[in-house]
Amino acid sequence: MLEINNIYNMDCLEGLKLLSDNSIDLVVTSPPYNMRTRIRNGEYTTREKSEHFSKKYEHFSDDLTIEEYYDFHKNVLTELLRVSKCVLWNYQIVTGSKSAVFKLIGDFADQI
């Protein structure tokens, strides 16, 4: 079990599994966007040209297949909805992730 009022530097899924149901009042998160391609200045840009957008994720490839990306978010959302009374999930639908995000919205429609 995690102690309250402490900061833990750990994988979010590992940490979430250590929390009790409904033990968090509010979660605000901005998950990785899986930016394989991105529209920049009205044009599609390859990941190589927009590398500085993805560099902040040192331990996350940000270049997952749609299936891997969906599974990652499904696991995180399942745990967030279990431990939190309210979840604010800031998400931008970018080119490389649209189908996974829309599937997640459909799969979690009754819970969100």
Question: Could you describe each region identified by the protein language model?
Answer:
Residues 2-112:
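Core catalytic lobe of class I
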